UniProtKB/Swiss-Prot annotation:
It comes from Homo sapiens (Human). One of its GO terms (molecular function) is frizzled binding. A lipid is attached at residue 215 (O-palmitoleoyl serine). This is Protein Wnt-11. CDD domains: Wnt_Wnt11. It is found in: Secreted, Extracellular space, Extracellular matrix. Ligand for members of the frizzled family of seven transmembrane receptors. Probable developmental protein. May be a signaling molecule which affects the development of discrete regions of tissues. Is likely to signal over only few cell diameters. One of its GO terms (biological process) is negative regulation of cartilage development. Keywords: Developmental protein, Disulfide bond, Extracellular matrix, Glycoprotein, Lipoprotein, Secreted, Signal, Wnt signaling pathway. Glycans are attached at residues 40, 90, 160, 300, 304. The lineage of its organism: Eukaryota, Metazoa, Chordata, Craniata, Vertebrata. Belongs to the Wnt family. It holds the Pfam family wnt. Disulfide bonds join 80-91, 130-138, 140-157, 209-223, 211-218, 283-314, 299-309, 313-353, 329-344, 331-341, 336-337. Residues 1-24 form the signal peptide.
Amino acid sequence: MRARPQVCEALLFALALQTGVCYGIKWLALSKTPSALALNQTQHCKQLEGLVSAQVQLCRSNLELMHTVVHAAREVMKACRRAFADMRWNCSSIELAPNYLLDLERGTRESAFVYALSAAAISHAIARACTSGDLPGCSCGPVPGEPPGPGNRWGGCADNLSYGLLMGAKFSDAPMKVKKTGSQANKLMRLHNSEVGRQALRASLEMKCKCHGVSGSCSIRTCWKGLQELQDVAADLKTRYLSATKVVHRPMGTRKHLVPKDLDIRPVKDSELVYLQSSPDFCMKNEKVGSHGTQDRQCNKTSNGSDSCDLMCCGRGYNPYTDRVVERCHCKYHWCCYVTCRRCERTVERYVCK
């Protein structure tokens, strides 16, 4: 009996969704670049793991950027693990780059977050590197056109966000511009989420000031535009992750677009993370779906949040254990000017999931 055409189409679409989805974040493997690799010659670009040919070309033509890109990859790893430390999915699989598990291989909510964070991180790192004078191709950001406010004056060195966004997008979006990398739906999803990450970075630009005046009177303040820390951007993106929208690839007019699965009468909002495939609950270990499980994960007995023992342990229960903590105590200030402390030890009770 021959399969019906619509069944075949559905199977092909499902297969496409599972193929090559994480191609755009393989560059995070740069976090493992040996410090001994100088990255001062173009032939070094071929030795870097996780890059597509377009990124290798960008490396060769912008060699001075690569230390900053490596730094960005390392910052993504740290920021993701910190942001999800209290969740069942704790971003541990990101450290397997470039050989990800299915939690990041597929078009999941988790991959949406990592794409957004990666795009934000590389632009953030480049913008900051311009400010610190580490890149010969850029300097401080432009002086804002609006007045700084009473008692303030523009000065200092602003983070060069425009240059960071330009060069960051060229590098992080390059894999999605390659023709043979998965389905069109996946490409649209990845590009959309990367732009959401850059949007979150733009929103983090704020006025920072330094006081001047006699005896700290702060009669005049020198101000500039600076980016928040990447961890703050990650926190913003985590909020968007929690409210991410599941989408489908459907015709709208003469072209196909990503539209919300449960409300396909409107286009996807520019500010929302989107995903194509639902994730497992990450309760049990199952590498087929990219789940490490939560067995032996630490939980908080008194919390009502995602790190609570009830939620983290998925109802399986938990085991208590005692831990000895050494900390500074009985600190005393001495004139002038130092502090002495004693070292105290106390026992705390902790809990891990069964």
